[in-house]
């Protein structure tokens, strides 16, 4: 029996897809937590969880001033496999 994906997992799937399609380019900042929460109809905790996972995968970097998209070349093959699921 499968369970429905969590809100954070849904956000991860959408953001990684948008990054791979070039909607967010390397070096570009993602929208603020507040803006993402409004867009996805979720709380900021789910946004933080999604961003943390994307950072662990090497897709984005969190720094003062916001979350920036990393170049795809920096991602490992394992990450690329995850992205293409």
Question: Where are the predicted features?
Answer:
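Short linear motifs at protein or domain termini
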Residues: 1-85
